[in-house]
Amino acid sequence: MFAEYGVLNYWTYLVGAIFIVLVPGPNTLFVLKNSVSSGMKGGYLAACGVFIGDAVLMFLAWAGVATLIKTTPILFNIVRYLGAFYLLYLGSKILYATLKGKNSEAKSDEPQYGAIFKRALILSLTNPKAILFYVSFFVQFIDVNAPHTGISFFILAATLELVSFCYLSFLIISGAFVTQYIRTKKKLAKVGNSLIGLMFVGFAARLATLQS
């Protein structure tokens, strides 16, 4: 399938893409957190931010920016530390709000929803490892002798985005159903938010110590 477009072993790629999407990460956690705290609208806005951010990174990977980042340690470190700082900021903000017992529902909906999208977009864009991963993973399934490798890259990127959409939709719908139950269990919600905040701090520490 898609061999005429320079895609090799598409079904193997699809299985690999599914397993990759299932691996927990900050983007997934952010979408799940917002689907629980802000419902399906908040979850899908977070997912849209992730999709757009990933699409930009995939395009940059295809355009050769990944090679530039990999061969320029200073540039890699700048993006890496920005990403780590942002993850730490998000984690600290969640922990602070949880400890203070702030009620996010008291805020107006539109600013909150706009912030969700922006945070998800920034979260996705400030991950230098993602752009390097796209190149190293995609190149295994592209026929370099094909006349239009850009089409091959697009097919692989679109497939990954579709798999991600299906998985995140499952999380969003599940999170929305959990929302009503969580709202009646304030202690449980507080523990859950604290764990999410700590996980973001952990992701920040891991990203800060990664090497190119």
From Swiss-Prot:
One GO MF term: L-leucine transmembrane transporter activity
Gene Ontology CC annotation, any one: plasma membrane
Reaction equation(s) it catalyzes: L-leucine(in) + H(+)(out) = L-leucine(out) + H(+)(in)
Transmembrane domains' residue ranges: 12-32, 49-69, 71-91, 122-142, 153-173, 188-208
Gene Ontology terms describing biological process: L-leucine transport
Location in the cell: Cell inner membrane
Induction trigger: Induced by leucine, L-alpha-amino-n-butyric acid and, to a lesser extent, by several other amino acids. This induction is mediated by lrp.
Keywords, in A-Z order: Amino-acid transport, Antiport, Cell inner membrane, Cell membrane, Membrane, Transmembrane, Transmembrane helix, Transport
Membrane topology qualifier: Multi-pass membrane protein
InterPro entries in UniProt: LeuE-type (IPR001123)
Transport as UniProt keyword: yes
Known regulation of activity: Leucine export is inhibited by the proton ionophore carbonyl cyanide m-chlorophenylhydrazone (CCCP).
NCBIfam families named among the record's database cross-references: PRK10958.1
Family under the similarity heading: Belongs to the Rht family.
Classification via PANTHER family: ARGININE EXPORTER PROTEIN ARGO (PTHR30086), LEUCINE EFFLUX PROTEIN (PTHR30086:SF15)
Role this protein plays: Exporter of leucine. Can also transport its natural analog L-alpha-amino-n-butyric acid and some other structurally unrelated amino acids. Leucine excretion is probably driven by proton motive force.
Record-given protein name: Leucine efflux protein
Organism: Escherichia coli (strain K12)
Gene: leuE
